[in-house]
Amino acid sequence: MYPESTTDSPARLSLRQTGSPGMIYSARYGSPKRQLQFYRNLGKSGLRVSCLGLGTWVTFGGQITDEMAEQLMTLAYDNGINLFDTAEVYAAGKAEVVLGNIIKKKGWRRSSLVITTKIFWGGKAETERGLSRKHIIEGLKASLERLQLDYVDVVFANRPDPNTPMEETVRAMTHVINQGMAMYWGTSRWSSMEIMEAYSVARQFNLIPPICEQAEYHMFQREKVEVQLPELFHKIGVGAMTWSPLACGIVSGKYDGGIPPYSRASLKGYQWLKDKILSEEGRRQQAKLKEFQAIAERLGCTLPQLAIAWCLRNEGVSSVLLGASNADQLLENIGAIQVLPKLSSSIIHEIDGILGNKPYSKKDYRS
């Protein structure tokens, strides 16, 4: 794991007392409180991101109305969240359109926002997907048009592309940065070996290496973020931006009694999630949630807040992306920040005992 408190930690922490916008109030989650918001460096870059970000997968341009999307973004921004993540493939580009319209309407300073998008699946034509120089440049241009922005802060390669030479991808990412279309680039769903290859190519040809990997991370999926990415951080400075802290809602407990209507697992095209929940492994996970519920009650928080705080306790995580379909959900999730200081080493040990899936690095085996 990462050292507890070094300036080299990928998530160098700072607290900002947010002013009037940082006032959080919900009768359900307690009295009005001035929110202390964490900011962390994205990997070893100088880019400061809120430790919670708002993702737009499934929700923006799809599951929720544009009015609800605006409400969620406003709530996030007012509570110090500066990171908003999308992708060219989300709702076939509509998520980017909705996000861009809201930014324009609200009149927020562009310099106060960190906007990230992902490139890989752009359209039906053979040349409209992948990580070729052609698609990276054309895809990002199209994304910027939908977002109505001059640049994104981070452009991610949304998955590895075995059909494109790594040098071509790294050169194209360097080009879009040099052209002012993006500030940084990162990877998503890449293996450690692929990220390392991109870094080596960048160093060999004096190009720009990636600063961050977007990875799935929650109580039931730990290996990559807890073992592989820390090694990459120490070697080449790549940080972790994580998604699905509630395992697509499984950890929220809402699937305890089956698949409720209007939930993500009930949506068309999400049969894989339904199958996952109803599988033998899914049932085992549901059983463990009852034990986590008892811990959450002891800490005076909800199960989703405990799960998100658990992700945040990992200093290797620069930011955790949240998905929410209504204001109450988002407010509850933001409240995880107040649970973070309550996660003592004994509580973490207790959670590890219930999960029984703590991954071990090579270093642990040697010791």
UniProtKB/Swiss-Prot annotation:
One annotated Gene Ontology cellular component of this protein: cytoskeleton
Lineage top rank: taxon: Eukaryota
Membrane topology: Peripheral membrane protein
Keywords: Cell membrane, Cell projection, Cytoplasm, Cytoskeleton, Ion transport, Membrane, NADP, Oxidoreductase, Potassium, Potassium transport, Synapse, Synaptosome, Transport
SUPFAM superfamilies: NAD(P)-linked oxidoreductase
Record EC number: 1.1.1.-
Binding positions for NADP(+) per the UniProt entry: 56-57, 63, 85, 158, 188-189, 214, 243-248, 254, 262, 264, 323, 325, 329, 332-333
CDD domains in UniProt: Aldo_ket_red_shaker
Pfam family, any one: Aldo_ket_red
Active site residues according to the UniProt entry: Y90
InterPro entries on file: K_chnl_volt-dep_bsu_KCNAB, K_chnl_volt-dep_bsu_KCNAB-rel, K_chnl_volt-dep_bsu_KCNAB2, NADP_OxRdtase_dom, NADP_OxRdtase_dom_sf
GO molecular function terms attached to this record: aldo-keto reductase (NADPH) activity; potassium channel regulator activity; transmembrane transporter binding; voltage-gated potassium channel activity
Gene Ontology biological process terms from the UniProt entry: regulation of action potential; regulation of potassium ion transmembrane transport
Enzyme class name: oxidoreductase
Subcellular location: Cytoplasm; Membrane; Cell membrane; Cell projection, Axon
Family: Belongs to the shaker potassium channel beta subunit family.
Record remark: domains: In contrast to KCNAB1, the shorter N-terminal domain of KCNAB2 cannot mediate closure of delayed rectifier potassium channels by physically obstructing the pore.
Summary of the function given for this chain in its UniProt record: Regulatory subunit of the voltage-gated potassium (Kv) Shaker channels composed of pore-forming and potassium-conducting alpha subunits and of regulatory beta subunits. The beta-2/KCNAB2 cytoplasmic subunit may promote potassium channel closure via a mechanism that does not involve physical obstruction of the channel pore. Enhances current amplitude of Kv1.1/KCNA1 and Kv2.2/KCNA2 channels. May display nicotinamide adenine dinucleotide phosphate (NADPH)-dependent aldoketoreductase activity by catalyzing the NADPH-dependent reduction of a wide range of aldehyde and ketone substrates.
Subunit structure: Forms heteromultimeric complex with alpha subunits.
Name of the molecule in the record: Voltage-gated potassium channel subunit beta-2
